[in-house]
Amino acid sequence: MEFVRLEVSTRDEYKGAQEPVSFVRRGKEYHVEQILDRWYEGRMDSTRMPLLYFRVRTHSGEIFILRYHEFFRSWSAVARD
């Protein structure tokens, strides 16, 4: 699975980068209407970097998988045409 970097705005309360609220992809801004699913990867394995995944639906009805890399504090999405 290939990912592309994104600019993401998040809901930050007691800690940073909790949930995505909007993101910009290829110059277009998308607003997250609903978080359909979330999961974590790499937290139990000290040899892997912790990653947070969010499957989201936008206001336009499109579905995206967003990923937050905790170490680099960067967001990306599954690359699709």
Residues covered by each model-derived region:
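Cysteine-centric segments in proteins
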Residues: 1-81
